[in-house]
């Protein structure tokens, strides 16, 4: 029987929410060369997978952050899934923009929360943690307490772990890079020869492929 992490990893690969191309790397917006591309929004188009992720995010939140009072989704990738989870848990929902609107009230946080609400932030993907932690900071600046963050997937970069620790934000994820590689190898999506390339990238993503 698959563990939850491997099950989620296999589903992300199945619907091509995660693509692995160690011999034909992608170029990220940051300029980094990467053997992986992740777009978890694709899971929203598949009801069974969408529901699985919703249920597991809700379960993890209930078990890890039992006194949660509200859910925040990080724009844009986690807005839909965050709203689904908030609905399942019967909790208020807001979402956090990457930058303020250029008109109106210039809000970073869209929606309403009671002051000092205990909030769990939902993210679809954790890379370095920079944008995710800005969202957590925005919730704190909104006058609320951030209990932690729950994400569908993380690359597992050491720098991300350090950033979350420094920001004092507890992070829990459903699956990660190692489990994606294991499932990709098991299903024949990648070859054994490619595994080392994939692991080398995670060690030094800034310089890999240059």
Swiss-Prot record:
SUPFAM superfamilies: PRTase-like
Superkingdom of the organism of origin: Bacteria
The keyword Nucleotide-binding is annotated on this UniProt entry: no
Keyword Magnesium: yes
Molecular function GO labels: magnesium ion binding; orotate phosphoribosyltransferase activity
Entry EC number(s): 2.4.2.10
Taxonomic lineage of the native organism: Bacteria, Pseudomonadati, Bacteroidota, Bacteroidia, Bacteroidales
Keywords for this protein: Glycosyltransferase, Magnesium, Pyrimidine biosynthesis, Transferase
Metabolic or biological pathway: Pyrimidine metabolism; UMP biosynthesis via de novo pathway; UMP from orotate: step 1/2
Organism: Porphyromonas gingivalis (strain ATCC BAA-308 / W83)
UniProt xrefs under PANTHER family: OROTATE PHOSPHORIBOSYLTRANSFERASE (PTHR19278), URIDINE 5'-MONOPHOSPHATE SYNTHASE (PTHR19278:SF9)
Annotated binding of 5-phospho-alpha-D-ribose 1-diphosphate, by residue: 97, 101, 103, 123-131
UniProt name for this protein: Orotate phosphoribosyltransferase
Function, in words: Catalyzes the transfer of a ribosyl phosphate group from 5-phosphoribose 1-diphosphate to orotate, leading to the formation of orotidine monophosphate (OMP).
Pfam families noted in UniProt: Pribosyltran
Binding residue positions for orotate: 127
Enzyme class: transferase
Assembly, per entry: Homodimer.
Family statement: Belongs to the purine/pyrimidine phosphoribosyltransferase family. PyrE subfamily.
Entry's transmembrane regions: none
Catalyzed chemical reaction(s): orotidine 5'-phosphate + diphosphate = orotate + 5-phospho-alpha-D-ribose 1-diphosphate
Gene Ontology biological process: 'de novo' UMP biosynthetic process; pyrimidine nucleobase biosynthetic process
Needed co-factor(s): Mg(2+)
């Amino acid at each position: 029987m698959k563990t939850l992490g491997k099950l989620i990893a296999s589903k992300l690969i199945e619907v091509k929410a995660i693509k692995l191309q160690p011999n034909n790397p992608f170029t990220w917006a940051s300029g980094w060369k990467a053997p992986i591309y992740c777009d978890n929004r694709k899971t929203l188009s598949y009801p069974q997978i969408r529901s699985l992720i919703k249920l597991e995010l809700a379960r993890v939140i209930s078990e890890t952050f039992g006194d949660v009072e509200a859910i925040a989704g990080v724009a844009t990738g986690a807005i839909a899934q965050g709203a689904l989870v908030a609905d399942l848990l019967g909790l208020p929902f807001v979402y956090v923009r990457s930058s303020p609107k250029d008109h109106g009230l210039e809000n970073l946080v869209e929606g309403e929360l009671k002051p000092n609400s205990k909030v769990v932030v939902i993210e679809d993907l954790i890379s370095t943690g920079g944008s995710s932690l800005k969202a957590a900071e925005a919730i704190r600046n909104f006058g609320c307490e951030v209990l932690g963050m729950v994400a569908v997937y993380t690359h597992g970069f050491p720098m991300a772990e350090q950033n979350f620790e420094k920001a004092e934000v507890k992070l829990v994820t459903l699956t990660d890079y190692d489990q994606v590689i294991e499932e990709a190898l098991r299903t024949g999506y990648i070859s054994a020869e490619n595994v080392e390339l994939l692991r080398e990238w995670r060690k030094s993503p800034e310089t890999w492929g240059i």
